[in-house]
Amino acid sequence: MRRSFLADYILYTVVRFLAVLFRLLPLRFSLWIGRRFGDVLYYLFGNRRLIAYANLKAAFGGRYTPAQLKGIIKSECHNLSQSFIEVLKFPVFGNEYVDKYIKVEGEDKIKAALKRGRGVILLTGHFGNWELSSLVGALRGYKMNVLARWQKFDMLNGYLNKMRSFRGANVVSKGDSREMIMRALNRNEIAGILSDQDGGKRGEYVKFFGRLASTPKGVAHFSLKTGAPILPVFIIRQKGPYHRLVIEEDISITASDDINVDIHEILQRFAKVLQMYVERYPGQWLWIHKRWKTTPTKYVLVLSDGKAGHLKQSLSVANAFNEVRVESGYAPRDTKIETLEVKFKNRFVRTLFELFSVLGVGLNRLSFCFTSRAFDDIKSRYADFIISCGSSLTGVNLSLKKEFNAKSIVIMKPNIHNVNKYDLAIIPTHDRPELRSNVVVTKGAVADINKASFERYASELRKNINITKDNIIGVLIGGDSKTYILQPELINSILDEVL
């Protein structure tokens, strides 16, 4: 507790000092410094930067090059740093600032909505400098109630809330938000709410960039219970200190007999509008957040080296993963399994790729190792899980794991890569693997053997062979090799499975 208090006090003191400093500096120069902070922030983010990159890949696929994706993340860092400085300068921002730097579009929609006497919900996301929306509203004379999440550090949180409320906005903490927001709407006031972060297992799943995203239900409940209209609001940073604040059309609906359907409809409408703005201005949204953290939809990418046996083993693991998820309550459609054939230009560059990937050289710098079509295919993919079988794909597996911030599964013992780098390694006994927490040892090759697969294989066999009672089907089991001898126990267990 003492350490937490000390960290809180230090951060609070530093922020207070920065606030005094930036209020003395001209706005443009302050924001220039903010962009330099953003450059530093980009490198400090570390794992968050990987999350942002993976989110962008999931959302846009191959629409942007890797360099463009990194540029979007840098723009996000610039926007966050500039927004923070603008919040610190709130006490010196007045109507003159708003008139000069912020162009408001659609304010008539707020005035018309307030005439209904049921309050208004201004709904936005972590987009642009969303904090400015409440400042503009308060300076325009509206009674603003802003819902804010309580942050980790009490002193710093209290100071930031003081900045938010400096021009008259009422900051509502999430602990007592339900009752206070309802009262504000019943008084025909405005409630400002952000609703674009992961809603956990209790959230409502809506489509967002083609994936199901859990979304908090609160805003829909407020509207349905009070009849308050919901106006999506987005503030776009144009250039430097200039912004454009856009108020969109009402997305609320009249309550029906099925509240669950109503909630879904409202949240899906907002997700659609939010996606439209994020697509237009990708560098102004908060990609570093795990937006799809609790999504039921998982993408599995199976890598193929062109060898049927290797591909079959990888698909067996992918299908088993799907079966486990179905047993856990997910629908079969929630697991998307795709296959990607990896084609190197020749054996030499394949070996080169393995060597450089061990040294940590990124996938994009090694693009020359692949055929142009193969690399274009790789760039367009996204996955939560990577599965591969065979030594030629071990480096590609790890490279894609880093590219997508995904989980990696390798079948067979990696040649030169450390097995600890994989989340799961499935290795047969004859490869003599070391026993580790991420290693599963098998007696033989992985096979897709279950009741459903047997029925599928039997159906395929009947199409090609006229099976009668007089026909006998033989089973051939591979023999010994230089490094492995088939044991009687293994043969008997295989025969038990077959017969």
Residue spans of the language-model regions?
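Membrane-anchoring hydrophobic helices of lipid-metabolizing enzymes
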Residues: 1-124, 157-162, 168, 354
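Non-catalytic C-terminal accessory region of glycerolipid acyltransferases
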Residues: 2, 6, 71-74, 114, ...
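Active-site and donor-binding regions of nucleotide-sugar-utilizing enzymes
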Residues: 16, 20, 26, 151-152, ...
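N-terminal phosphate-binding or glycine-rich loops at protein starts, especially the Walker A/P-loop
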Residues: 32-35, 280, 298-327
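A nucleotide-sugar donor-handling region in carbohydrate enzymes
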Residues: 100-103, 419-487
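Catalytic core of membrane glycerolipid acyltransferases/transacylases, capturing the structured
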Residues: 116-175, 201-204, 331, 419
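Conserved catalytic-core segment of nucleotide-activated headgroup transferases in glycan assembly
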Residues: 118, 133, 142, 310-313, ...
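Structural motif
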Residues: 190, 299, 384-385, 424, ...
